Structures are given as structure tokens and as C-alpha cells.
Regions:
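A cross-family signal for N-terminal binding/gating loops and helix N-caps
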Residues: 1-348
Length: 348
């Protein structure tokens, strides 16, 4: 199989990029029968009818942190940081983070800056990705308070507006529990509490995984032969309780439907050859593209993804390249909204 990135491009008018969400339970879903059959556009709550008792929905319970902070150099220059992940505190108990920074020249090792009003020191530069290790003159708990007060929602780069108060709720899913993501697992944004209640009442299991989505989710693939692409790592965890729920559903003949590429990444990373799971935590670098055979996932609910991205490749691995691009063409022709705050598709 040829791995040409240019084969996964599609055209779309810029006005279809959703800059705000329609609201939980108020989006549209393009239903794509996995084994053929006519695709059709449904209102999000209507997808409940497509599930059977005994099916299992797998969601990501990560919580987006207000990870974008602004500050200044000692000379008054404006700077911006995106906190990627918390690191072990310093010996004296100060908070340390790996961060993406701008402009890079302001963040030389040994430099002192003021970020969100906090004295900040540059400890390391990562040669590979340009990320910095920053030490803040606050404890981790104090730094969390600073972020909640001064931090901004890290909206995706293609949403061309500043974040505001609405985003604090809109960019958080109803499943969000464990802080650590710098991007939302956006497929879960389609679910309202009522939809969740209706699914459970129907006898659908709901299992949770945790994958802290990193900024690498928006990373462009820079090589035409995408098999040479080096995937970013993301921290994940699957508890015994949730592994048991998924395994029971599978064993009893239910369909396992992952909500989003992030949940998919976790269960396919962990699944054994027979598609069963054990509790596990770690960092996944898994990269799924056409040719990959899914071990566990029977259905996938996901948003429409950026052309030539690792995410559209993951979907194409599940649904096939031609099917995926045909579905995207139908979405564009019907003016469905695209990307993080947009509409979605259910392959089942």
C-alpha cells in the first residue's frame, strides 16, 4: 500500500470552520453505515437509536486545563507559553512544566521572565521539538490557582479568534474529570447529559479512558510518505473497572464504539491480539493509518478532521480512504461544520 499524504487532502470553504459550537446535543452527525448502506445526516440526539442494548461507548474523561499564559521578559517584551505537561517539582517544591513558547529567543536557558505575574526560570531547551522546561516560583497547587485565574483556553490554531468566557464551558466535555489536556477530546462535545441518560436507559454501557491530549494533536505531517512520520506521545490510563466493562461488552457480543480518536488510541494501544484489555497506564506513540487492522473497535464517533492530518489517517484506517473522503465530500456539500467545534460522523 502506498502511503502518500497528498491522497488524504480535501477542499472546503473556510466558512465551514466552526468558530463556536452549536452546543452539547445540538450538533449534526453524519451516520455512515460501516458495511455499506446510505449515509444520512442526523441530529445528535437521534444517534441514540443506532445503539443496541449491550453495546459499549468508550469516552475520554480528560479535562482541558487553561494552559495558555501570557507574560513578559525582563525588558518588557511580550511572550506566550502553552503548558504541555506538569513535571516533577523542584527540590524546593516549585512547580515545573514542559511548555511550548513564543518567541523562542526570549526563552534561553537561565533566563528569568514573568509569566502571569509569576517569576519564571528557563531550565532546559529540548532540541527535538523546541519545548522548554520552565520553573515557576509557586508550588504546583498555587500554580493551579494562577492558571484558573489567569490562564486562557488553548483553542486550536484554526479557530481565528481569542478565547472568551464561553469557551471555558463549551470546550469542556460532560465527561471531563482529570485535568491534563491542552485540547479537548472534541467528539465527546456532541453529548448532552440527556443523551447519556438515554443511552444508559437503553442498556448501553459507558466506559471511560483517560488520555491527556497534547498540542501534538495539531502537528502537521511534514513528509509525503506518512509511514515515516514520527507520532507525538500522549499519557493515558485505563483502570481495571473500565477494562472490565469493555471486556464484558465484547465477550457478550456487544459493539465497542469509541468516542473520538483519543479513546480509539488508548484501547487500540492496549488491546491484545483477541481485542481484550488489561488495566494499564503509560505513554502511547501509536500511529494508525490505512493498512492497520483494528483489534477491538467496532464503531467510531469522531469529528471532521484537518486535511492530511494523522487524525484523518486514523479514520481512513477504520473506514477506508475512499469511504472517508466521500463522507467528507457529503459533509461539505451539506454545509456541516468542520473540526473541533463542528459536527461529527458516526461509523457504525
Amino acid at each position: 500500500m502506498e502511503c502518500r499524504l497528498s491522497d488524504y487532502n480535501f477542499e472546503f470553504p473556510k466558512e465551514l470552520i466552526a468558530s463556536r459550537t452549536a452546543g452539547k446535543g445540538k450538533t449534526h452527525i453524519l451516520y455512515c453505515p460501516k458495511n455499506g448502506g446510505e449515509r444520512r445526516i442526523m441530529k445528535a440526539p437521534e444517534i441514540v437509536d443506532l445503539f443496541r442494548p449491550g453495546d459499549c461507548l468508550v469516552v475520554n474523561n480528560t479535562k482541558v486545563i487553561p494552559a495558555r499564559l501570557y507574560g513578559e521578559t525582563q525588558f518588557g517584551g511580550q511572550v506566550e507559553v502553552l503548558l504541555v505537561q506538569a513535571l516533577n517539582p523542584s527540590e524546593s517544591g516549585e512547580a515545573r512544566f514542559e511548555a511550548k513558547v513564543h518567541p523562542g529567543k526570549a526563552f534561553q536557558v537561565g533566563r528569568e521572565l514573568k509569566i502571569a505575574g509569576v517569576r519564571t526560570f528557563v531550565e532546559e531547551v529540548h532540541e527535538e521539538d523546541g519545548n522548554r522546561v520552565l520553573r515557576f516560583e509557586k508550588t504546583p497547587a498555587e500554580m493551579e490557582e494562577v492558571m484558573n485565574k489567569e490562564g486562557h483556553v488553548p483553542l486550536p490554531p484554526y479557530i481565528d479568534r481569542p478565547d472568551d468566557e464561553d469557551d471555558k464551558k463549551a470546550y469542556q466535555t460532560i465527561f471531563a474529570k482529570y485535568a491534563g489536556a491542552v485540547a479537548a477530546p472534541t467528539a465527546s462535545l456532541h453529548f448532552s447529559e440527556q443523551m447519556l441518560e438515554d443511552l444508559k436507559a437503553k442498556g448501553v454501557y459507558v466506559a471511560e479512558v483517560t488520555l491527556h491530549v497534547g498540542p501534538g494533536t495539531f502537528q502537521n505531517i511534514s513528509v509525503e510518505d506518512f509511514s515515516q512520520h514520527k507520532m507525538h506521545g500522549e499519557h493515558y490510563e485505563l483502570t481495571k473497572e473500565n477494562a472490565d466493562i469493555i471486556n464484558k461488552a465484547k465477550r457478550d457480543g456487544g459493539r465497542v464504539v469509541t468516542v473520538g480518536t483519543t479513546s480509539t488510541r488508548v484501547v487500540e494501544t492496549i488491546a491484545d491480539a483477541n481485542g481484550f484489555l488489561k488495566p494499564q497506564r503509560g505513554v502511547t506513540y501509536a500511529f494508525f493509518y490505512p493498512g492497520y487492522k483494528y483489534k477491538l473497535v467496532d464503531g467510531l464517533l469522531t469529528n471532521f478532521h484537518w486535511p492530511k492530518s494523522s487524525l484523518i489517517l486514523l479514520v481512513s484506517a477504520f473506514y477506508g480512504r475512499e469511504n472517508t473522503l466521500e463522507a467528507y465530500k457529503m459533509a461539505v456539500e451539506n454545509k456541516l461544520k468542520l473540526f473541533s467545534y463542528g459536527d461529527g460522523m458516526l461509523i457504525l
